[in-house]
Amino acid sequence: MLKRTPRTGYRFLGTGEESVAEHLFSTAFIGYCLAQLDEGVDAFKVVKMCLFHDLPEARTGDHNYVYKKYVQVDEERATADLAAGLPFADEIKGLIAEFNERKTPEALLSHDADQLALLLQLKEHKDLGSRYADEWLRNNAKRLQTEVAKGLAEAILQTDLSAWWFKKEDADWWIKGK
């Protein structure tokens, strides 16, 4: 269901699309990276939290910041319903609750991974010419809570989308193919 559930914020940005499943994968990868860069954090727990934090959206749909001004979602009920009958239901519910409370180091890193996944998408849209992405980027970066995420965000914002494949030292490759 999550691979067919669209992230709805892009409607307001005017460009792009992403499913909740795509977002969760990106968030989990970023969460793993952040956990590896931050000492004393349980990386496996961060990855699980990143993978599970939007599971309720399989029942509720994705509610972006504009929607949340007007609609209240019963995420606890959605989580309880989707986890019902699973032998690991308590773990799923606990990880989602911990993510939402944002009190543990793992929850803070997971929340920052969630924001960095959006930041990466916004940076791509900016580099491709979206006129609204800059304002979104400024607001998104303000949500980051950990120093490791803030450092990564700074590096992302200073790097062009094509920099990884279009390096100056590889300029001859683009001409000669070698």
Functional labels for PLM-detected ranges:
Residues 1-178:
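Alpha-helical, largely C-terminal catalytic domains
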